[in-house]
């Protein structure tokens, strides 16, 4: 444990510029965003899919989270937030050395160019950790589009390449002082960098990987709705760090952002549920979680920049526009019907993220901008920004969409030359047991290799002996736990 000297102002661990409150909040916000991915989305993915894909889906999220960290500290962070190499990209470099990590951080967007340099009251290590959590969750969200059929080895190759070649470009352009930031495109906490990127890249990946089996597309019911709600709840609560950490300080802007985040999420959930009741005569728990998600995504581009009444307005749109694209437009579009986006990431993240960016361009107030932005004159169209700000929001979105579409395609086509992107149909029929040799629950009947009818087992009554030869054969075949023949 640390010695009492950690509390001494005369020691290097407590430099004059360190604000313990800001540092503590930023580390807390980092942890909250981390909890969104692991266990939040790990639990959500493992429960919202069919039982035979629970392990594979959870592992894809877990692997993306872990692999992102090493790539991030080796080269990714400085490509996204380091010195400028190109107007949309930073210079690669490690973020592993003491000399780099213990010094005072610099807000990435003010590190170069004509914008005054701003230094928060904590070390660079805190900033590296905070921004890692955003990079990781973007890949975890992207995974939702290709669950239930992507070759896990192809996914393992895809995650580092996409992080380096796609995510870092959006992050530098909008947050690292790149050309979109200097132009005045508003993205408070990741509506474009994270959600629009993951939605477009996920949809593109789903196209190239190919669809699930027909039987899985037709019937893909969640294996545990209660766990799905728990995972969604972790995601919602973690969003306090997601948007509350964006000002890089424990200040007024953080308070406004956290309140607006919760207001928009609740409004969107209620709006989505009402539409389900009106059109389908009953509320859907899955729909409620989707409505919660679209509300959280929609408020993200402007969480600390809009008034709370505007967060209600954004929640109404967040619960209705993605609902319409998913429930109505999707069924009328040949392209949307063809591409098998497993968890509808395109609708819940790309559509909601773009919607949030446009609404922020309308509703952002100059007074709230002045609390945290170093770019002068930014304001929504309703506050004097005019159509010009909407044009900037649409232009920024167009760049993010085009870059993710092209780069994701190139990465997957390159990987496909060496590793099949999709599992063979034989493995898709089986699921987790074929992909990992493991199952979420010890229940026979949904995707396992073992066929009880081929092994002379009693199906109940008094003739079966679990401790006899049948039980021994089950053990030899690798069955784990109590089995139920379905």
From Swiss-Prot:
InterPro entries per record: Ammonium/urea_transptr (IPR029020), Ammonium_transpt (IPR001905), Ammonium_transpt_CS (IPR018047), NH4_transpt_AmtB-like_dom (IPR024041), RhesusRHD (IPR002229)
Organism superkingdom: Eukaryota
Region called Disordered, residue ranges: 454-473
Tissue expression as described in the entry: Expressed in roots and leaf blades and sheaths.
Residue ranges with Basic and acidic residues bias: 454-470
Transmembrane segments: 29-49, 57-77, 127-147, 161-181, 190-210, 225-245, 252-272, 285-305, 309-329, 343-363, 399-419
Gene Ontology process terms (BP): ammonium transmembrane transport
A GO MF label: ammonium channel activity
Subcellular location: Cell membrane
Keyword field contains Isomerase: no
Database matches in Gene3D superfamilies: Ammonium transporter AmtB like domains
A Pfam family this chain is assigned to: Ammonium_transp
GO cellular component: a single term: plasma membrane
Reported induction: Not induced by ammonium supply in roots.
Keywords: Ammonia transport, Cell membrane, Membrane, Transmembrane, Transmembrane helix, Transport
UniProt membrane topology term: Multi-pass membrane protein
Described function: Involved in ammonium transport.
NCBIfam families documented for this protein: amt (TIGR00836)
Family affiliation: Belongs to the ammonia transporter channel (TC 1.A.11.2) family.
Name used for this protein in its record: Ammonium transporter 2 member 1
Source organism of this protein record: Oryza sativa subsp. japonica
Gene: AMT2-1
């Amino acid at each position: 444990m640390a010695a009492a000297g950690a509390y001494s102002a005369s020691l290097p661990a407590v430099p004059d510029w360190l604000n313990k409150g800001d540092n503590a909040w930023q580390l807390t916000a980092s942890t909250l965003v981390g909890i969104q991915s692991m266990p939040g989305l790990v639990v959500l993915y493992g429960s919202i899919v069919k039982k035979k894909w629970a392990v594979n889906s959870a592992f894809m999220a877990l692997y993306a989270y872990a692999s992102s960290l090493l790539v991030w500290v080796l080269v990714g962070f400085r490509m996204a937030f380091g010195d400028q190499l190109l107007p949309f990209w930073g210079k690669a470099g490690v973020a592993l050395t003491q000399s780099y990590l213990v010094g005072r951080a610099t807000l990435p967007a003010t590190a170069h160019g004509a914008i005054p340099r701003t230094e928060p009251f904590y070390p660079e290590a805190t900033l590296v950790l905070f921004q890692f959590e955003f990079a990781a969750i973007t890949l975890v969200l992207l995974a939702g589009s290709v669950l239930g059929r992507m070759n896990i080895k192809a996914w393992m190759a895809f995650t580092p390449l996409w992080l380096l070649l796609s995510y870092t470009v959006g992050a530098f352009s909008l947050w690292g002082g790149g050309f979109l930031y200097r132009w005045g495109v508003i993205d408070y906490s990741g509506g474009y960098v994270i959600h629009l990127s993951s939605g477009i890249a996920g949809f593109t990946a789903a196209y190239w990987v190919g669809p699930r089996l027909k039987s899985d597309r037709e019937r893909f019911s969640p294996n545990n709705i209660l766990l799905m709600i728990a995972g969604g709840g972790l995601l919602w609560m973690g969003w306090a760090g997601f948007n509350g950490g964006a000002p890089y300080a424990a200040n007024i802007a953080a308070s406004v952002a956290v309140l607006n985040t919760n207001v928009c999420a609740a409004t969107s959930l209620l709006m989505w549920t009402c539409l389900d009741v009106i059109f389908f005569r009953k509320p859907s728990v899955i729909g409620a979680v989707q409505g919660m998600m679209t509300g959280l995504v929609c408020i993200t581009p402007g969480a600390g920049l809009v008034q709370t009444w505007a967060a209600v307005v954004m929640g109404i749109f967040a619960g209705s526009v993605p609902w319409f694209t998913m429930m109505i437009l999707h069924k009328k579009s040949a392209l949307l019907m063809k591409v098998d986006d497993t968890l509808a990431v395109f609708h819940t993240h790309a559509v909601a993220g773009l919607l949030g960016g446009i609404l922020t361009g309308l509703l952002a107030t100059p007074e709230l901008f002045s609390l945290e932005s170093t770019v002068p004159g930014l304001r929504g169209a309703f506050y004097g920004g005019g159509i010009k700000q909407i044009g900037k929001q649409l232009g920024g979105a167009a760049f993010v969409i085009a870059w993710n579409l092209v780069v994701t395609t190139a990465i997957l086509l390159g990987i496909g030359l060496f590793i099949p992107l999709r599992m063979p149909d034989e493995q898709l029929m089986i699921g987790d047991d074929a992909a990992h040799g493991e199952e979420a629950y010890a229940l026979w009947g949904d995707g396992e290799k073992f066929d009880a009818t081929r092994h002379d087992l009693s199906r109940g009554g008094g003739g079966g002996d679990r401790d006899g030869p049948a039980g021994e054969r089950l053990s030899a075949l690798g069955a784990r736990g109590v089995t139920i023949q379905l």
